[in-house]
Amino acid sequence: RWYFYINSAPWLPNRFHGKAVVEGQRKFMGTLWNTYAFFVLYANIDNFDATKYTLNYDQLPVMDKWLLSKLNSMIIEVDDDLDHYKIPEAARALESFVDDMSNWYVRRSRERFWAKGMEQDKINAYMTLYTALVTVAKCAAPMIPFMTEDIYQNLVRSIDKTAPESIHLCDFPVADEKMIDKKLEEDMKEVLDIVVMGRACRNTANIKNRQPIGNMFVKADHSLTDFYVDIIEDELNVKNVTFTDDVRDFTSYTFKPQLKTVGPKYGKQLGGIKEHLSSLDGNAAMDELKAKGALVFDVAGTKVSLSEEDLLIEMSQKEGYVSEADNYMTVVLDTNLTPELI
């Protein structure tokens, strides 16, 4: 059922194959169930009862506020998608939230659940994850009725007999827009993007995460506060993360013509174009491309204008550095291992 929801709109043809079904089950339903099982395991150990506590937003740390912001943004998105019969979009929004909840929030908050006693920080973590699990179950109930019913009966009905008898008798969740903080969501997305690129750099350099790294440099649209930098350093096992406006000391670019598009437009000048592109200062050319949207130059009296679609761009790095980049961010990892790091 989930495979058909998320794969394509109901009125379009759908190719069915077993591997895709298994992958869909693992990616969403398996992740949701594992997160629920994580909560239940530690809630049972601590005899946690959500009816005895309240969720005080003003007392919450940043990670809790981020998850609640994502949760309420997801409610709005899923509700609107279902209103307009956008089934795949609603399913993808649910899947994306569950991925963030499991692979980022729980990952970053596990030690809070392991703490001894029931200090306020631990209560905050329990209440935040409890709220997220119950709410996402209600949002997903029309699509996965049986799993969400199990979650609801165990998390809600077992401690509150006044609650509706079934999740399918509950109202669809309504977003609390006061909990939505788009700046917080954007900053955390940048953290996640940097972490993904940093891991890719480690993989390229064949350096495992347990090996500390001295320095990482990030060129992005805006820098992040120390709170987020500390998360990046911890996730990537890097001693120092530095935001910079220029990574020229570590990287450069090479340009070649995209023959499919450049050939039909400038066939006779193709040789001259290749020669010109090979002679460019890579960083200066990339700056021009981003600023003007094209590289403009003259070849044998013919004006040539090449957009990003007309170019094959490769990023090269200096020895001892590995980099990853997309359209708005570059991450450079210093792979030089000093005796102190080893």
Model-based region annotation:
Residues 13-21:
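Short, solvent-exposed helix-loop connector elements
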Residues 20-342:
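Feature 926 captures the class I aminoacyl-tRNA synthetase adenylation module centered on the KMSKS loop
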Residues 1-14:
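Alpha-helical recognition segments enriched in aromatics with Gly/Pro capping
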